[in-house]
Amino acid sequence: MAHKKAGGSSRNGRDSAGRRLGVKKFGSEAVIPGNIIVRQRGTKWHPGTNVGMGKDHTLFALVPGKVQFETRRGREFVTVVPLAQAAE
């Protein structure tokens, strides 16, 4: 009787590349319009003031300013405080 399994082709050994999701600009970092703030699947973070959302739920800056993360009504929001207000 053979004590070893016959060597065949393995059915494992595949993996997909990481999707590079996550926060790209952290709290109080400076951004310009079009800068990506968060790449995400679904709405873990919601767009706040001066932040737009792409069709893949990517959040991006609409005005130059500083990034701010905040929780309102049990949801996490990302806002951009415009430069004029951020300086005050």
Swiss-Prot record:
Q: Name one GO molecular function term.
A: structural constituent of ribosome
Similarity comment: Belongs to the bacterial ribosomal protein bL27 family.
Any GO BP annotation:
translation
What is the organism of origin for this protein?
A: Methylorubrum populi (strain ATCC BAA-705 / NCIMB 13946 / BJ001)
Q: Which PANTHER family match?
A: LARGE RIBOSOMAL SUBUNIT PROTEIN BL27M, RIBOSOMAL PROTEIN L27
This one is known as: Large ribosomal subunit protein bL27
The stretch of residues making up the signal peptide is none
Q: What are the boundaries of the region Disordered? A: 1-23
Look up the record and report any one GO term of the cellular component aspect: cytosolic large ribosomal subunit
For this UniProt record, give its keywords in alphabetical order, as a comma-separated list: Ribonucleoprotein, Ribosomal protein
- InterPro entries xref list: Ribosomal_bL27, Ribosomal_bL27_CS
Q: Which NCBIfam families does the record cross-reference, listed alphabetically? A: L27 (TIGR00062)
